Amino acid sequence: MVIIWILLLSFISCGPQVSWAKRLEREPKYPCSRGGKLCDPRQRRDAGGRGGVYEHLGGAPRNRKLYCATKYHLQIHLNGKINGTLEKNSVFSILEITAVDVGIVAIKGLFSGRYLAMNQRGRLYASETYNPECEFVERIHELGYNTYASRLYRTVPSGAGTKRKASAERLWYVSINGKGRPRRGFKTRRTQKSSLFLPRVLDNKDHDAVRLFHTNAVYRESILKPSKPSGRQRRGQ
């Protein structure tokens, strides 16, 4: 009789453990972000230590137009030129803004295929390839506009001969002046109109242009075809 009671108690104590183990085995697995391996959903949610809040980082780019407070849209041209345009539906003002890190974005011209970049002299240019000069710190201004500052370059005051604190660094901002021309980064401030940009969603005409660019080879070639030089020459040439 004692042996029967011992066997019964051992069966009761082991039963829930076996059941719980089977439930863990049956729990669905999901693909991890890398390698295509299956992993626990909690591990997938905590990957990178960010949780689900920043799952959009590194994802699909946002198609936007950057409208400067000086009333110009930022353009990235095929020839590497950066400027502003008053034209509402210029195809070279349609941009892809992609988050590459927390608060860091890369800005690419959808039609030119070039990246917005700032060199060590504070000049804006359109780079054919992605490099560290193409990374910008994106911040939301208190007026509702965004600012874009070079991640790589900034003005660091020297410790000697200055009243500024050593930590008072000055960022170099992307800017378009009142004539549609880019200003050098170290000459701008985040409160100036030339450095304030409003990301605008594309309208119907912009969406039609994007669709044609991806589906119509003739239209795409007409956009990518270099413009012919003007017949008139400048004076002194």
From Swiss-Prot:
Domain of life assignment: Eukaryota
Family of this protein: Belongs to the heparin-binding growth factors family.
Entry-listed glycosylation sites: 83
GO cellular component: cytoplasm; extracellular space
Gene: fgf3
Biological role: Plays an important role in the regulation of embryonic development, cell proliferation, and cell differentiation.
One GO process term, biological-process aspect: fibroblast growth factor receptor signaling pathway
Pfam family, one: FGF
Record keyword Glycoprotein present: yes
UniProt source species: Xenopus laevis (African clawed frog)
Protein name stated in the entry: Fibroblast growth factor 3
GO MF annotation terms: fibroblast growth factor receptor binding; growth factor activity
